[in-house]
Amino acid sequence: MSTGNVYQELIRRYLVVVKKLYEGKYEVSRSFSYTMFSLLVGIIGKQYVTVFYGVPVWKEAKTHLICATDNSSLWVTTNCIPSLPDYDEVEIPDIKENFTGLIRENQIVYQAWHAMGSMLDTILKPCVKINPYCVKMQCQETENVSATTAKPITTPTTTSTVASSTEIYLDVDKNNTEEKVERNHVCRYNITGLCRDSKEEIVTNFRGDDVKCENNTCYMNHCNESVNTEDCQKGLLIRCILGCVPPGYVMLRYNEKLNNNKLCSNISAVQCTQHLVATVSSFFGFNGTMHKEGELIPIDDKYRGPEEFHQRKFVYKVPGKYGLKIECHRKGNRSVVSTPSATGLLFYHGLEPGKNLKKGMCTFKGRWGLALWSLAKELNKLNDSIKVNQTCKNFTSTGEENKQNTDKQKEFAKCIKTLKIDNYTTSGDRAAEMMMMTCQGEMFFCNVTRIMRAWNDPNEKKWYPYASCQIRQIVDDWMQVGRKIYLPPTSGFNNHIRCTHRVTEMYFEMQKIDSNETKMQIKFLPPSETSNQFVAYGAHYKLVKIMPIGIAPTDVKRHTLPEHHKEKRGAVILGILGLLSLAGSAMGSVSVALTVQSQSLVTGIVEQQKQLLKLIEQQSELLKLTIWGVKNLQTRLTSLENYIKDQALLSQWGCSWAQVCHTSVEWTNTSITPNWTSETWKEWETRTDYLQQNITEMLKQAYDREQRNTYELQKLGDLTSWASWFDFTWWVQYLKWGVFLVLGIIGLRILLALWNTISRFRQGYRPVFSQDCQQNLYRKRPDNGEEESNSLELGEHNSENLKEESLNRSLIEDLTSFARE
């Protein structure tokens, strides 16, 4: 039986055992099954690390977005590259992702806000950064009171749902009865003219809180506290900017309402955001996408519990069915002239200084009542302390009854007016308490106190839609510390300023009305938090970086593609976005199309590079002097660096330009193996993320060892190594080492012999004969006849021994003294 058949038979038996365990009384977990399967695979044979290039894996990233636009105005083209006619979008099925992170860490929101600030600085570019109005002025305060006036309205507006004969709605107060009292200062000051010793007196108007006066001697407020810059031109703010990712990156977009209680599944991969609204406003977001349903997006740095609900901030996406809009206008009742000064500045002032020339009017149209009621219902889902009557839609009547039945109108008004709004009656910075917006390049600051007061009164059955506005020239900088001085309103008696803004978002925070926190109200956010206008768009996006290199254990046999793999080429033709289309598929099915997939990935990155380079070359003359031009070039370099880094890493592992690369590194973690039939690459990467560092180091070491072995093998097989035997220099070198070895042995022998001799001499006197021989001599005594002859011989022998002994002693003494010395 072959290895493959044995493997299949063991798998079959394993599945039978697991099935019986599940059917029995014992409960077996899924992890136990995976562990048993892993042990089975380990018993069958070793597994080795295999490198895959082109897997659908990503991680959150931070990089510069590319500013793209299809607008042809100069101020946009100097900062952005032209956008493409269309951008691809690919759905990613069977993938869940978390989109409820911190808003301040969302790269789309953060970069869109800074990009828009750069754009607005370009639109409203100051001439020079000096304090043009920091001079002594003589001013007189006047009050221009617009008494109670009636403003005819030709088209009635409702605040209910879709107008029909069966729905009751709030009637609209057609009379503008708000008293508008604005303090106005008529100021005179001198500037040096263009001629020598000539001065010119300037007379202009300032809003009451823009100047600080003592005895009619005034200076512009905050003159010594911040930088004041004068604007030189006007511009129109329109929807024209896209935020696009550089090559190698993708934006994930969630296509449903955000939910903190579960992961998001309806996800698609895109290259660019939707059009960003290039406007600056407070309280409301204008001219954005028409939302199908309401959605609350928290913008707090951290989640707060119910006990701190009054401190939370939100962005509410207003459903488009309510048709909320704000119409603003200013009559063409003034002219503007400019006066040059010796410093090169142009001071703009009006020809009619005695009148309040900067007033405008805005009208709130649409079904505001039901819109605020729907907001209350969304807040009630988060906190039960927000009381909402869910039966307000049950109030119905005919059209004639709706006009006559005032009691039913009052009941309907009380029903929907459960959410209170801060009416800004407390003292404070009036600029922060007024609704700010741009209207044809002018800065409108509108007082909405009367509107909020009418809404907070449950007995008021009518909707009051009017807000008086002031066109301000001195405005706080919303991006940094400082104040900007804008041009006076557009000149010309017949030049009316008109604009209509669709309300698509509301920006507010929760406040407690009493100390017991039983009642709460909302407070719209001031202009200092203009970054909130991008939360409604950016919260549904996540910037990620493609990680195309994957590592997984496989069998020793090289993975081969089936014969029909060419049919899958069309499924991944979208390049880098097509790579993510298989993110929810199993690892095995992705590996089948991996060759074409990785080729498509490389092709997609290269194609993005070509498109980006072509667009940058078209705008090179305009982009080279701007900061955004540098950022756009930097994004291209970043994407190239990432691609080269991946290829260098594959080269270190010996997997250059290989889609599936088998290695000799053993997979030691037998308890962690992929489920090729049901597990995705994203899930596998999450499980083995902590092993990546060790595996990559082992791959590098294994490839280095393989390279050394290959080099040594090549050396053995090289014929030139055998020819070195006939080289004379080679023989001389080894002969020299042989001579040194022989001389060393001889010297060692001499030293050992000398040491033995010295050691013997240092042992001292030793008897010539042994004790046994002396005993035998005494034991065998000779006869008397022989005694004399033996004694003579013995005497001679003793004398010789004494001489020898004395000689030895003298020699030992000499050697001892020599050794001591």
Swiss-Prot record:
Residues 715-736 are annotated as: MPER. Keywords: Apoptosis, Cleavage on pair of basic residues, Coiled coil, Disulfide bond, Fusion of virus membrane with host membrane, Glycoprotein, Host cell membrane, Host endosome, Host membrane, Host-virus interaction, Membrane, Transmembrane, Transmembrane helix, Viral attachment to host cell, Viral envelope protein, Viral penetration into host cytoplasm, Virion, Virus entry into host cell. Residues 328-361 are annotated as: V3. Residues 187-223 are annotated as: V2. Residues 780-805 are annotated as: Disordered. The chain crosses the membrane at residues 738-758. Residues 446-469 are annotated as: V4. Residues 515-526 are annotated as: V5. GO terms for molecular function: structural molecule activity. Residues 570-590 are annotated as: Fusion peptide. SUPFAM superfamilies: gp120 core, Virus ectodomain. Residues 607-627 form a coiled coil. Residues 139-186 are annotated as: V1. Some of the most genetically diverse regions of the viral genome are present in Env. They are called variable regions 1 through 5 (V1 through V5). The surface protein gp120 (SU) attaches the virus to the host lymphoid cell by binding to the primary receptor CD4. This interaction induces a structural rearrangement creating a high affinity binding site for a chemokine coreceptor like CCR5. This peculiar 2 stage receptor-interaction strategy allows gp120 to maintain the highly conserved coreceptor-binding site in a cryptic conformation, protected from neutralizing antibodies. These changes are transmitted to the transmembrane protein gp41 and are thought to activate its fusogenic potential by unmasking its fusion peptide. This is an African mandrill isolate. This is Envelope glycoprotein gp160. It comes from Simian immunodeficiency virus (isolate GB1).
